[in-house]
Regions:
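Bacterial N-terminal signal peptides
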Residues: 12-23
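Bacterial N-terminal signal peptides that target proteins for export
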Residues: 2-13
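A "functional boundary" signal
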Residues: 24-272
Length: 272
């Protein structure tokens, strides 16, 4: 299944959520209505749907331009291009990341293997991901946080989509353990906001730590703290970026937990 198909499936799910939320908005009593923000966001949302293909063309042009200016025989270049393809064209991402796994420099080979495992887990190839995970030891210390994150994702996907209950429980425990290890590892670092590329993917440990802190606060029902963390990040990142969408969606989940229907709809639209 290609990334494009997966994207369409996720879009259908999002549209269903939005349609339900909008229908509820339409029948709410008038005293609950915000002045104009929901209507404005709905108009923006319609415009963004119409211009979706322009973003695809923009990304394609950016990748093609970058490929023409760097040495594509170098593992680091292959990793860079492979990561850019991940949310856009799955087959190309697999191709370039697989090439980079043959790098003679151990850290580059294992870095690309970790990205490849993450991608394989995302598209349902769990067995291949687990097989590759057995090739990672010994692991360069610089990749420890990425290793924890990747294995948490791999076990998490296997838990959600697995069929055997005993194995699902095993993967759930493993995912939780790796997430805890990642949380501890990130907290031990002196992390600060750094430049976030419009096309960046999973490269900013400060953002990952903030996301984990937000989720932890939400799980503890400390919604004020969760919203504060989200606001801190959203003030730093630009709209119309992948990072903004992620944290806007996390904010959506907070307001859903709080049963704040208007704020839920507002942030659902912003995240989309």
């Amino acid at each position: 299944m290609t990334t494009t198909v997966i994207g369409r499936i996720r879009l259908v799910g999002l549209l269903c959520s939005l349609n339900f939320a909008v229908s509820m908005y339409a029948i709410m009593p008038s005293y609950t209505m915000p002045t104009s923000i929901v209507d404005s966001l709905l108009n923006v949302y319609d415009t963004e749907i119409e211009s979706a293909y322009s973003y695809i063309d923009e990304r394609r042009n950016y990748i093609d331009s970058l490929k023409s200016t760097i040495d594509m025989t170098l593992p680091q270049s292959q990793i860079t291009i492979g990561k850019l393809y991940i949310p856009y064209q799955c087959d190309s991402a697999l191709f370039y990341l697989s090439q980079a796994t043959h790098a003679t420099e151990e850290i580059r080979a294992k870095e690309s293997t970790l990205y490849l495992i993450y991608l394989l887990a995302s598209i349902g190839y769990y067995n291949e991901g687990f097989i590759l995970s057995n090739t990672l030891q010994p692991l360069p210390p610089e990749l420890l946080s990425q290793y924890y994150e990747t294995l948490a994702h791999l076990h998490g996907e296997a838990f959600v989509y697995g069929k055997m209950e005993e194995l699902k429980q095993f993967h759930q425990r493993q995912a939780a353990a790796y997430k805890d290890s990642l949380f501890i590892a990130l907290q031990q670092k002196e992390l600060a906001p750094t430049y976030i590329s419009r096309y960046g993917w999973k490269e900013n440990e400060w953002l990952e730590l903030k996301k984990m802190q937000l989720i932890h606060a939400r799980e503890q029902q400390d919604y004020e703290q969760a919203i504060s963390i989200s606001n801190e990040v959203l003030e730093y990142v630009a709209p119309n970026t992948h990072t903004y969408a992620i944290f806007a969606y996390e904010t959506t989940c907070i307001y859903n937990d709080m049963q704040e229907s208007i704020e839920y709809l507002v942030w659902l639209l912003r995240s989309s």
